[in-house]
Amino acid sequence: MAVQQNKKSPSKRGMHRSHNALNVPGIAVESTTGEIHLRHHISPTGFYRGRKVLKTKAEA
């Protein structure tokens, strides 16, 4: 069984955990519809950067 040689100080423990933080996803608001969507993704209504780029199932 693995056993630590020396106790890790609170400072070193914090440095070790410094990359474990969760990131908030980049959220954007569509300018034409006002809907919230992920950045660089099409909104649920088929708009991207103010232009209609995809027909939704309701329209087809």
Curated annotation (Swiss-Prot):
BP GO terms, sorted: translation
GO-annotated cellular components: large ribosomal subunit
Coiled coil: none
Classification via Pfam families: Ribosomal_L32p (PF01783)
Extent of Basic residues compositional bias: 9-19
Signal peptide: none
Keyword Translocase among UniProt keywords: no
Renumbered residue ranges of the record's region Disordered: 1-25
Keywords, ordered alphabetically: Ribonucleoprotein, Ribosomal protein
Domain of life per record: Bacteria
InterPro entries cross-referenced by the UniProt entry: Ribosomal_bL32, Ribosomal_bL32_bact, Ribosomal_zn-bd
MF terms (GO), sorted A to Z: structural constituent of ribosome
UniProt record similarity statement: Belongs to the bacterial ribosomal protein bL32 family.
Protein name: Large ribosomal subunit protein bL32
Gene: rpmF
